[in-house]
Amino acid sequence: MHDAVTRPTPPADATAWPRRITQAVKIGGVTVGGGHPVVVQSMTNTDTADIAGSVKQVADLWRAGSEMVRLTVNNAESAAAIPRIVDKLRMMGIDVPLIGDFHYNGHQLLAAEPACAEALAKYRINPGNVGFGKKKDLQFGQLIECAIKYDKPVRIGANWGSLDQSLAAQLMDENAQRETPWDAGRVLREALIRSALDSAERAVELGLPRERIILSAKVSGVQELIAVYRDMASRCDFALHLGLTEAGIGSKGIVASAAALSVLLQQGIGDTIRISLTPEPGQSRTHEVIVAQELLQTTGQRAFTPMVTACPGCGRTTSEFFQELAGVVQNHVRAKMPEWKITNPGAENMTLAVMGCVVNGPGESRHANIGISLPGTGEAPSAPVFIDGEKSVILRGENIAQEFIGLIDQYVERTYARRAG
């Protein structure tokens, strides 16, 4: 039996619901849950045994802003590689927590490679394939005992595609006895939730503290994910990892992830997220990190980099210059953020506007910390710049982009300079 958790009362103003109160889970130098900011994580797609390739991708993901990185640990070679990957990253000054993703044979790999068990910051366990039949409880117990021995947290991650079939069959049989049976989808959602919750309670019985457990119950459908997490959040106080199990490729994957996760986050549900995008050909793996950050920032959860507002363009904006400038500005502030984070803390909260005509340009620019209203079709060839709501200067000529970038840099230095002491 799982304790019910009272759902927060929704706010009357334009803010998100209060965050759900959960256990706080320490993962390396990162804390998940317990009211801490929602954590961005990602996963490599390299062969973990390829140490050089894995180190490079983890470093790339970390530089992009991933606060934890998960790697596949599926054989002896990948398990043996983990300590060496950690060592090489630390030599580069990168101390990002690494999560081992285990399926089927994790109990064997951790027992055979104690250095791997020690080097990882967290273990991911799938209750649907940790063992089958009589071996399930034994092998799950071995993984939990390893987590206890090395003082490591775990994520117990149930998955729609690898659901515990014995539990699903049991719940289907129980459902058939109901006076009013549930539909099959509801039974399977319940099986997914029960798989995660029952496994978590079993881990606690074995001696793993509740503050060492994170749960997830992933599906690929937006409405199903929302329903699963709302239900699971009401039945426990474990920290929750959000994400579609396979979001998809391109805009579909981004939209599906945003549609599902933003609803849950606005209701105070979720302590760490991963956007499981299928990379497009030639696209960097870091794209999923950027999308995760932008989702958290646009929903008001966290700030990572100055946000640029830009109009979509219409018949009044036949020039493409405002589009080009918006891209230049976004790339500039993203490139500067690693430096600003140290020298100008708070710059990530800055808002910028790059507008293309007089209709909304001045108004949007006044709402931003710094905004520029470029001339539309038939308008005078001048671009007023607004700083903190006041018209500051009018830019003209061939160097508008460089001058506007300079004004942004000056504003950051003036407004967010780190104070001595």
Curated annotation (Swiss-Prot):
Keywords: 4Fe-4S, Iron, Iron-sulfur, Isoprene biosynthesis, Metal-binding, Oxidoreductase. This is 4-hydroxy-3-methylbut-2-en-1-yl diphosphate synthase (flavodoxin). Binds 1 [4Fe-4S] cluster. It catalyses: (2E)-4-hydroxy-3-methylbut-2-enyl diphosphate + oxidized [flavodoxin] + H2O + 2 H(+) = 2-C-methyl-D-erythritol 2,4-cyclic diphosphate + reduced [flavodoxin]. Pfam families: GcpE. Disulfide bonds: none annotated. It is an enzyme of class 1 (oxidoreductase). Transmembrane segments: none annotated. [4Fe-4S] cluster binds at C311, C314, C357, E364. It comes from the Bacteria. Its cofactor is [4Fe-4S] cluster. Converts 2C-methyl-D-erythritol 2,4-cyclodiphosphate (ME-2,4cPP) into 1-hydroxy-2-methyl-2-(E)-butenyl 4-diphosphate. GO terms for biological process: isopentenyl diphosphate biosynthetic process, methylerythritol 4-phosphate pathway; terpenoid biosynthetic process. Its EC number is 1.17.7.3. Belongs to the IspG family. HAMAP family: IspG (MF_00159). NCBIfam families: ispG_gcpE (TIGR00612), PRK00366.1 (NF001540). InterPro entries: Dihydropteroate_synth-like_sf (IPR011005), IspG_bac (IPR016425), IspG_bac-typ (IPR004588), NO2/SO3_Rdtase_4Fe4S_sf (IPR045854). GO terms for molecular function: 4 iron, 4 sulfur cluster binding; 4-hydroxy-3-methylbut-2-en-1-yl diphosphate synthase activity (ferredoxin); 4-hydroxy-3-methylbut-2-enyl-diphosphate synthase activity (flavodoxin); iron ion binding. Pathway: Isoprenoid biosynthesis; isopentenyl diphosphate biosynthesis via DXP pathway; isopentenyl diphosphate from 1-deoxy-D-xylulose 5-phosphate: step 5/6.
